[in-house]
């Protein structure tokens, strides 16, 4: 996907990872607003720097249990820092663990020791480690020894790595607004975390992008009432190349939303007319 106008966000994150670690950074925003794309661009542009990125895209994995989490998080290898060869387009790494290690015997304290040992190895080599978790909330329902919630214990570790010891940056990406609210109310993270919003694209940015792609002023003005997300712009540009008009593409979107609302209405016992009809009238105008 084309990298749309995100210079402000890109510069913020590139600068942030080069500062001394002092807090956990939560990067949040609407689904599909481009958080992962921006973060991956940061990694790409800094791949020849002295920064070592440990990047975990949790949306790609079914991390529903302790064992699955460990298999995603660690790479069995003789080295403590291992190149993640499953991500071909980025120079990113995983925490190494002994090849004969039995994951079923790994305690939470063992996990933390392994993480810290790998981070210290990076630092001893004169480099700066950065831990990145994409869609961190997927770890919410994982418990370790003694039914300890993994996420709460990870946050304690993150505070130690950043605020207390200044060893490593920790960046957590999420599109779950309820999760962000939970984090914000977490007293253990007070004064130990920062928040950065990657929101929908601004209208001026959308206008400039569409102008570059050859859309007329009339088409652009029509689009601005409906566009906000990068994937929508890509869809609009691709459909134009395929011969669909702007109106036809947007009508497709509206019909999809309308069908979704209709399904919701058909499968609920709530007062349909009172709750949903005002919204249906808006999207069918």
State each model region's role.
Residues 138-186, 195-198:
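Sensor-1/coupling segment of RecA-like P-loop NTPase cores
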Residues 18-20, 121-125, 160-167, 188-190:
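Conserved catalytic network of the ASCE P-loop NTPase/AAA+ motor domain
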Residues 21-145:
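P-loop NTPase nucleotide-binding core
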Residues 2-14:
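N-terminal pre-P-loop "Q-motif" helix
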């Amino acid at each position: 996907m084309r990298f749309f106008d995100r210079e402000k966000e890109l510069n913020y994150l590139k600068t942030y990872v080069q500062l001394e670690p002092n807090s956990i950074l939560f990067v949040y925003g609407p689904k599909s607003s481009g958080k992962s794309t921006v973060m991956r661009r940061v990694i790409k542009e800094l791949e020849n720097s002295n920064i070592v990125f440990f990047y975990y895209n949790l949306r790609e994995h079914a991390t529903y249990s302790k064992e699955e989490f460990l298999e995603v998080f660690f790479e069995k290898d003789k080295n403590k820092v291992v190149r993640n060869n499953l991500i071909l387009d980025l120079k990113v790494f995983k925490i190494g663990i002994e090849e004969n290690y039995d994951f079923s015997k790994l305690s939470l304290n063992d996990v933390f020791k392994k993480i810290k040992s790998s981070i210290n190895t990076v630092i001893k080599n004169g480099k700066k480690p950065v831990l990145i978790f994409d869609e961190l909330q997927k770890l919410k329902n994982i418990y370790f020894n003694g039914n300890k919630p993994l996420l709460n214990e990870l946050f304690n570790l993150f505070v130690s790595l950043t605020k207390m010891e200044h060893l490593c940056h920790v960046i957590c990406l999420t599109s779950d607004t309820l999760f962000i609210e939970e984090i914000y109310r977490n007293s253990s993270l007070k004064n130990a975390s920062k928040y950065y919003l990657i929101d929908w694209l601004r209208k001026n940015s959308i206008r400039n992008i569409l102008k570059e792609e050859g859309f007329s002023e009339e088409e652009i003005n029509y689009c601005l009432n409906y566009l906000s997300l990068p994937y929508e712009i890509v869809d609009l540009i691709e459909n134009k190349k395929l011969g669909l008009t702007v109106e036809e593409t947007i009508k497709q979107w509206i019909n999809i939303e309308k069908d979704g609302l209709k399904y919701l209405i058909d499968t609920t016992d709530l007062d349909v007319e009172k709750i949903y009809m005002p919204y249906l009238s808006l999207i069918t105008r």
